[in-house]
Amino acid sequence: MPYIEKLELKGFKSYGNKKVVIPFSKGFTAIVGANGSGKSNIGDAILFVLGGLSAKAMRASRISDLIFAGSKNEPPAKYAEVAIYFNNEDRGFPIDEDEVVIRRRVYPDGRSSYWLNGRRATRSEILDILTAAMISPDGYNIVLQGDITKFIKMSPLERRLLIDDISGIAEYDSKKEKALEELKQAEENLARVDLLIKEVKKQLDKLEKERNDALRYLDLKDKLEKAKVSLLLGEIKILETQIKEGEKRRAEIEEEIQKIEKEIEKIGKEIVEKVKVLREIEERIEKESGEEAIQITKKIGEVTSKIELTKRNIEVAKEELEDAQRRLAKTKEELRKVLSEIEKSKGAITRWKKRRDALINEIKKKEEERNVLVVKLGEIDKTFGAAREEFDSVVKELEETTRKMYEIEGNIRRLQEEKEKLHSRILFLRAKLPGIKEKINEFKAVVEDKRAEISEIEGKLSTIQAKRIKVEKEIEAKSNELEKVSKELESSERELIAAEAQREVRGNRAAEELKRSGIGGIYGTLAELIKVKDEAYALAIEVALGNRADNVVVEDELVAEKAIKYLKEHKLGRLTFLPLNKIKPKHVDSSVGLPAVDVIEYDQKIENAVKFALGDTVIVNSMEEARPHIGKVRMVTIEGELYERSGAITGGHFRARGLAVDTTKLREKVESLRRRKEALEGELNSLKIELRSLENASFELRIKLSDEKKELELASKDLNRLLEEENAVKEEIEESERKIQEIEQKIENEKSELAKLRGRIQRLERKKEKLKKALENPEARELMEKIRIIDGEISSLKEELSRIESRIESLESRLNEELLPRKASLEEEIEGLVNKINALKNNISENEKALELLNKELEKLKSIEENIKGEIRTLREKRKKLEEDISKLREKKEVLQRKLQELEIEANTLKVRDAQLNAQLEEKKYQLTHYDKNLIKSIKEIPLDLEKVKKEIEKMEEEIRSLEPVNMKAIEDFEIVERRYLELKSKREKLEAEKESIIEFINEIEKEKKNVFMRTFEAISRNFSEIFAKLSPGGSARLILENPEDPFSGGLEIEAKPAGKDVKRIEAMSGGEKALTALAFVFAIQKFKPAPFYLFDEIDAHLDDANVKRVADLIKESSKESQFIVITLRDVMMANADKIIGVSMRDGVSKVVSLSLEKAMKILEEIRKKQGWEHGN
């Protein structure tokens, strides 16, 4: 960051004509001097050289007043000049030099001159350089005398504008203003273009329809002509293709007819042979599927049932074996547990007996000890002894009774446990019973169902056998009848084919119908109306006429229209009519050959029609004679080769026409025979299907009958087993219930005995207590007490002994009555299970052997059955194959016969059709000559759908009529106006895009402007609060935006709370408080955005020493970042400075000198004394 190294003044204010150099420290420089010495003029000089324009700010009336006015010893200066030297080592100025010198001179007339590093410069150039280094003559970093509170006196808006300036958002406002100007211009341009577009669009809309109509008219004209040519070309191509295909097809038909006739004969022989073989196979099937096959099937069923029964026996035995093995393992495990319990019980009994013996010995010792005491006591009181003996007797009896009571309680517990076990077993068995009963019911139902099904199957088998015999007889009868009908139909179809062919050759049915319609003016077909003079030319004339032979000659076009209407109404097809009043005859050069019209006879009234059909044709003798004239004239040879004018040549075998025959009755007969044959075939096929169905059903029922009998046998066995199991469960439940009753009786007896014992114990206890009282002798009390203690011990030992004996008895009872018997029972059960397992294994083995024998027998029977079935299956397959072959052969024969008939009709029809097509082809080629050759050549693709082309032609002709009259000039006019319209539209789109871009740019500017401002404000606000707290310990202050949401619509308020005082608005503060607040604001800005230097003139004037000290400390700290030049009269401020400059006034001229701190202190002290200014004020 640059800083001021020195200041040079000459003729500036009070500094005289000589050059004065004022050096500054990089950090904190203090300027001191008496009032009026000229120290504040240094601040004015800095403001001046930086380009300041306000004379008032520099404490002058006008700018020329800054020139030295002279003194007693010096004349007035001719100009005032100030040079400021900046250190630029860090290149804060955008000048590549270590020092930047700015010089300004003002003349008496107010003119100013500027220099930059010795080079003349303009003020704006100087300001630009200063701005680049963040220096401004109007900056907040220059606070002249009395200006410190200007920050406080600012309006909220001015303070906010100061933040605007610090944040650098002015550039955003500049950009926005420029963008708004551009936006305004864009909107004006848009408005002008919109007016033009509107006007041009009116013209364009008007011209568009006229232009579209004109273009459509021209396009339709071209398309129409092209479509007509395309239609002709398409029709010609189709006709040529049809003629070629027809000739090829006729040759194929002749060859195919010969093949079919041979094939029909061959098939007839093959059918006869196959029918013979079929009858032989049916006889063998009947024989093979007789009684022997049924007996084998029955035996297989019986053996299969035995196998299933044996398998079931093995399965049951295995299940029982598995169950026995499981029970054996379970019983062995239980025996192991019982043996373990026995050992445990024996061990426990031994242990308890040892403890019992020990207790008996101990009781014995205690009783001996007690007897000694009793003897002593008896010596004291003889009566006491007798009482004591009775007491002891009662105690002994009480102990014995108590022991018995414990024994009975143990018995009751054991009996109850046994009872609970029996109850659990009964519950288990009762839960099992419903399942067994359910299965019994299921198997009963199965048995009944199986018996019913067996009966039903046997009935069905009888019915099927009867039906089968009946169907076989019907098949034989129908087969004989079918053979007879087929022969008759074949003969009739041959007759019909011949008749139909002759009729097709002879004439056109539709023409015949027309002649019988009663419409006047119909003469007949050309074939009927002409006669060949010489038979040698008959073939040539027939070929030359082609399809035109069937053209109908009529009086005029009205007759033709009536005939066409008749054909439509009666759906008789289509015919070509030759109206004599409209048809134009054709002519030919007779020098090439014999004109075709010369070899025929006809009525002169139909001459136009005859010459239309044959007038352009000549007859030549051979192909050699025709060759030189191909493509020049239409020719036909005597043998029937046809040469078209187009160059097309038609030739090959040609069948002449025969006489017509009436075929109505013959056709009816054929149709009747066909229907009968189809009916017989359908019936015969249905009967054969029914027979096969009956055979299959019979076989399936026999198999099912065998299966049902097996299932019945198995179900019956399962039912018997379940009934036995149900009885066993019921018997076990009854036995368990009987045992429970016995146990309950025992429990009741034991409880009764227990109640008696408890009553006896109560009586003995009362007697014992009474005897105790009798024994209470004061003289024997001590002995009695000892005896009582011993009695208590004996009693406790005896009670324990009683419990032990009861426990031993309980253990021995469980051992002898439960464990040992259970052991014997389990051993017996194990022996029984082992025997059962061995027996089951033997049973399984025997059954498996029997099963093996049965399987072998079944395999043998199945082999026999399979051989029979295989033979029958083979025969049936052969029969089926033969039936299918015969059916296919008959179908094939019928197809061939129909095909033969169709081919013969088709051959004759093709002959007639080809002649018609040739005539049509010549007509189309003639029509094509009316169109431009280039147009014809331009059509590369011939349409396929000619009907569609015809509809398009009609549609185009209709549209052309609707468009007339047409303004052709509208095409050119529209193009001119349209270009203008599109240019304007393009221009408008660009203008609209430009407008949107400007609006988007403005929005971005506003957004970024606010973000930059808020970041600046938040940082300065934070700094302000921190610095104010330092300058006024215990106080607080903050900056407040009037409108935080839209900061640019409001100002910036300052709210401060000096230490120990309430929050105050600026207006209510004292001078010192205002100064502190203002300084906090300045230093908050300095901390956020340090300026290169700060110039403060007597900012501490209203502060006490404590506040001055804090301000001075803050300046000292801030001088590490920026240069500070402070004009002051306070020693506290001066004491913190890095450099002190003294200013004095002599003879009206200010002098500058560098001072030490001591010297500066003395000068200040002298100034105070001289001016009566007390320290601290």
Swiss-Prot record:
GO terms for biological process: chromosome condensation; chromosome segregation; DNA replication; sister chromatid cohesion. It holds the Pfam family SMC_N. ATP binds at A34, N35, G36, S37, G38, K39, S40, N41. Keywords: ATP-binding, Coiled coil, Cytoplasm, DNA-binding, Nucleotide-binding. It comes from the Archaea. Residues 167-506, 659-1012 form a coiled coil. Residues 521-627 form the SMC hinge domain. It is found in: Cytoplasm. Disulfide bonds: none annotated. SMART domains: SMC_hinge. One of its GO terms (cellular component) is chromosome. Its main location: cytoplasm. The keyword Metal-binding does not apply. GO terms for molecular function: ATP binding; ATP hydrolysis activity; DNA binding. Required for chromosome condensation and partitioning. Binds single-stranded but not double-stranded DNA. Contains large globular domains required for ATP hydrolysis at each terminus and a third globular domain forming a flexible SMC hinge near the middle of the molecule. These domains are separated by coiled-coil structures. The N- and C-terminus interact to make up an ATP-binding cassette-type ATPase domain. The SMC hinge domain mediates dimerization and binds DNA. Belongs to the SMC family. Homodimer. This is Chromosome partition protein Smc. It comes from Pyrococcus furiosus (strain ATCC 43587 / DSM 3638 / JCM 8422 / Vc1).
